[in-house]
Regions:
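Ferredoxin-reductase
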Residues: 2-87
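FNR/FR-type flavoprotein reductase catalytic core
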Residues: 77-164
Length: 164
């Protein structure tokens, strides 16, 4: 776990008040595990003082190396500040934090269940499971359709069940 200043490579509103923020991945994050999170600090100053705990949502190869994504809802000043970052700006993060989870090697069929923003770390897992040739069914839940992670952003072979 280290404090790192990461450059923003992409930022977008995905749906409703949910945003994705892609950041350059520092070397200290190479060992990140599914289910881990970062504390993202919402300014270069001390207001707001506390970081925001945000799950590591996805990983990818970018133009300048590995990148990781944070998926979050805008619910206050801190997450609003994060949502307004643009490529080239920086965000300070501490992590990876928490006890991630592993998948048993012999399991071929996986059922992943997540609701609302709670599905964020499962998307990275689904990406990797599909890449490994495993079958994935994902149950996405939310209070309304507006709070469901868009199924078209999942790998095409993932079977999706939506519940509201």
């Amino acid at each position: 776990m280290q404090s790192e200043v990461c450059e923003v490579t992409e930022s977008a509103r995905l749906y409703g008040n949910t945003y994705i923020l892609w950041l350059q991945m520092p070397a200290s994050f190479q060992s990140a595990a599914y289910g881990q999170f970062v504390m993202a600090y919402a300014s270069e100053y001390s207001d707001p003082l506390l970081g925001r705990a945000i799950s590591i949502h996805r990983m990818r190869e970018g133009e300048r190396g590995r990148e990781f994504a944070l998926l979050f809802d805008v619910v206050g000043r801190g997450t609003d500040w994060l949502a307004r970052r643009v490529p080239g700006e920086s965000v300070r993060v501490v992590g990876p934090l928490g006890r991630g989870f592993e998948v048993r090697p012999g399991v071929q069929r996986m059922l992943l269940v997540g609701g609302g923003i709670g599905c964020a770390p499962l998307i990275w897992l689904a990406d990797d499971l599909v890449e490994q040739g495993r079958e994935v069914t994902m149950i996405l839940g939310g209070r309304s359709d507006a709070q469901i992670f868009p199924p078209h952003l999942l790998p095409p072979s993932v079977e999706v069940v939506v519940t509201t």
